[in-house]
A protein has these predicted regions:
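Conserved Helicase C-terminal RecA-like lobe
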Residues: 15-33, 41, 52-177, 181-185
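SF2 helicase/translocase ATPase core recognition
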Residues: 6, 13-44, 160, 176-252
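Short, flexible segments with low predicted structural confidence
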Residues: 7-9, 113
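Short amphipathic alpha-helical interaction/hinge segments
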Residues: 9-12, 48-49, 68, 72-75, ...
Length: 252
């Protein structure tokens, strides 16, 4: 039987899986994020793009998306000219010794959420991001808070990935957080040891997000599942969410 694969879609399995709750969590940008966001939108680079003279629209989109996660994902002040005038007192770009949680609206919400899960439940949770830089932030946060975690991204050897997932799925494992790159593992990665999942940033392709959101809601799951999509309000992430909705309505 090991030579064969049983192909079953979620349409079939959903009849036998526990209930799944999906939530969209809208988070305000921090004052620092908002100031940087406004600075970039008013920059000469964006003005050139709006006039049709710019040659790097994808770079601009990338800056906005990273800024929605945390200012530390950018190379400041190089990525945003003049941003050093907006730095909060004591802020040091690129400081890897700690995580400035308060400088990101989404990370502030996530930190309080993880602390609540840890103290009030025995649930495990998967944290997914499109950026390994965001996973680096999560990892530093977990180490500082002494939260047990595993991490899987594209740099991990394929042979080691399933072993790591199996360790996390073991109910006796003390680690309650699984850090996952959205593109790692393909369609077959089942992290059923967790029944909660946070998608920290959206992808333009709704199929990619749906695949990521289904990691915990797979065959073998015994508990009710909760998935949370974090969206920075008033930002490019709302536009991405809107585009996803439009694409899904066209395909349905």
């Amino acid at each position: 039987m090991s030579q064969f694969i049983i192909r079953r879609s979620n349409d079939i399995l959903s009849k036998y899986l526990p209930i799944k709750y999906e939530h969209v969590v809208f988070c305000h940008l921090s004052p620092f994020q908002l100031a940087l966001y406004d600075l970039f939108l008013r920059s000469p680079a964006i003005a050139r793009l709006l006039r049709g003279n710019g040659s790097q629209p994808l770079k601009a989109i990338g800056i906005l998306k990273k800024l929605c996660n945390h200012p530390d994902l950018l190379s400041l002040p190089d990525d945003l000219e003049g941003s050093e005038e907006l730095f909060p007192e004591g802020y040091k770009p690129g400081d890897r010794r700690h995580v400035a949680v308060e400088l990101s609206g989404k990370l502030s919400v996530l930190t309080r959420f993880l602390a609540s899960i840890r103290s009030t439940t025995d649930d495990k949770i998967v944290l997914i991001s499109n950026y390994t830089q965001t996973l680096d932030l999560f990892e530093r946060l977990c180490r500082l808070r002494r939260w047990g975690f595993f991490r899987l991204d594209g740099t991990m050897n394929i042979n080691k990935r399933q072993k790591l997932v199996d360790r996390f799925n073991d109910p006796t494992a003390p680690e309650f957080i699984f850090l996952l790159s959205s593109k790692a593992g393909g369609c077959g990665l089942n992290v059923i040891g967790a029944n909660r999942l946070v998608l920290f940033d959206p992808d333009w392709n709704p199929a990619s997000d749906q695949q990521a959101l289904a990691r915990v809601w797979r065959d073998g799951q015994k508990k009710a599942c909760f998935v949370y999509r974090f969206i920075a309000t008033g930002s490019i992430e709302e536009k991405i969410l809107q585009r996803q909705s439009d694409k899904q309505s066209l395909s349905s």
